[in-house]
Amino acid sequence: MIKNFNVPILANDQVAENVFRLTLDAPELAETSHAGQFVQVKISDAFTLRRPLGIASTTNGYVKIFYRVVGRGTQVLSTRHAGTRLDVLGALGNGFTPRGGKILLVGGGMGLAPLLCAAETFSADVLLGGRNAGEVAFWCNEFKPHAEEIFVTTDDGSVGVYGFVTDALPDVLAKKNYSAVLTCGPEIMMRGVAKLALEKNLPCEVSFEKRMACGLGACLSCSIDTVDGRKKVCKDGPVFDARKVFA
């Protein structure tokens, strides 16, 4: 059930260049949310619109959220300190489908945040990509307690496989009998991941990152085309069957 929470900030730490990890003491939100869902955060009274942020972790009653400072709203959010309280609406949207077997998580950039929550929930390996060793280092540390095996690619080849996650994906898929592929990141990356997964007849779910205003399906600002017509990322997603959106 969607609720409005006013919760204390436990930490708001910078973990990489322009990337922050926000930790909230929110046991009820943690208990009722599912991997792949998101929240709408009210930055302050000075901002009319909330900011949609994916839920990255829900362990021990704490909700963790990763965000990149890209504008005035997230810049102000990065200045919020432990001990203050945050207005959060959630959990919103439809998350990943519960399933058994070994799942492969494939992500890049901030798209790795909702996949971290999936790694806490499912038995999973992760294939993660970034620009360089520094960008992927903190993600590897976050996934280590939850993922059985971590595969890495970097654009500059400084660590892991040189190239993109789609370059490494065929070899990773050949290593094990995965039951499904879950992916989140840039749309062009997800399209490539979905193509390779579906060629192997593997179920594939994609999680879209879209700008949105209301987060409740009223404003239509986050609508996308699917084989079933226009759908709202905030309400019908953000997780979709890849066959429905990349037909």
Outline where the language-model segments fall.
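FNR/FR-type flavoprotein reductase catalytic core
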Residues: 75-208
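Local cysteine-cluster metal-coordination motifs and their immediate loop/turn environment
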Residues: 114, 187-188, 209-238
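Short, Lys/Arg- and Gly-enriched loop/turn segments at beta-strand edges
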Residues: 47-56, 93-101, 234
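Short, basic/aromatic-enriched C-terminal tail that caps enzymatic domains
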Residues: 1-3, 230-247
